[in-house]
Amino acid sequence: GFFAFIPKIISSPLFKTLLSAVGSALSSSGEQE
């Protein structure tokens, strides 16, 4: 089913790039407060 694709999505370079971008955005917004 759908859940079989989750490990592939998580291990994909694009997901890691997106995750790091979101993480840096969250940390930067947290510093502003």
UniProtKB/Swiss-Prot annotation:
The keyword NADP does not apply. GO terms for molecular function: toxin activity. It is found in: Secreted; Target cell membrane. GO terms for biological process: monoatomic ion transport. It holds the Pfam family Pardaxin. The keyword Membrane applies. In aqueous solution exists as a tetramer. Consists of a C-terminal hydrophilic region and a predominantly hydrophobic remainder. Exhibits unusual shark repellent and surfactant properties. Forms voltage-dependent, ion-permeable channels in membranes. At high concentration causes cell membrane lysis. Belongs to the pardaxin family. This is Pardaxin P-3.
